[in-house]
């Protein structure tokens, strides 16, 4: 990709649902993640040496322009389309994965939501932390603005863990270190793998 002199490159980890993973292993071989960190380190070394900067744990760009489907600029967001998800006021919503059902909902002026769950306070805080870690920076000021409290008070255990292992540094604004890039990549991969499992379940049952 470097020979093409492209401005942005995104490297996605394997996020297969259980059935997809089984199908891949039948066709190719057992999915082996033992060398995943080594490959990720090769990617980091290669892009950094060529002047790219990390925008997320997956996306690297040169210059100011950057497009990433996984970047979240707002704390709440609404997903549009079949199979999309939303988070609004601490509630997690899932749209129907069935195109006919989606069309039926919309034609009747109904929301296509087929499931929702109120996140616990801890889940909401940890989800916020995960998305900020993925974007490589956790701003304590924005956290106070959002949750009306100090991040070290609400997420002290999590932050001490991250700092102890050298995955983040800083005080009010925490930056993900190079050592922390791979663990953050894994955490986000597991989050989307879980979503893909939900997607597979709903599609199979035309929910």
Residue spans for each PLM region:
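Short amphipathic alpha-helical interaction segments
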Residues: 148-163
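Non-catalytic, well-ordered alpha-helical scaffold segments
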Residues: 123-127, 156, 181-185
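C-terminal scaffold of the Radical SAM
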Residues: 1-149, 206
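A short, conserved structural fragment
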Residues: 163-173
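Residue-level detector of family-conserved "landmark" positions at structurally sensitive sites
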Residues: 11, 57, 154, 171-172
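Short, conserved phosphate/pyrophosphate- and ester-handling motifs at nucleotide-, phospho-/glycolipid
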Residues: 177
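Short, amphipathic alpha-helical interaction segments positioned at domain boundaries
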Residues: 181-207
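Long, highly charged amphipathic alpha-helices
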Residues: 42, 154-157, 186, 190
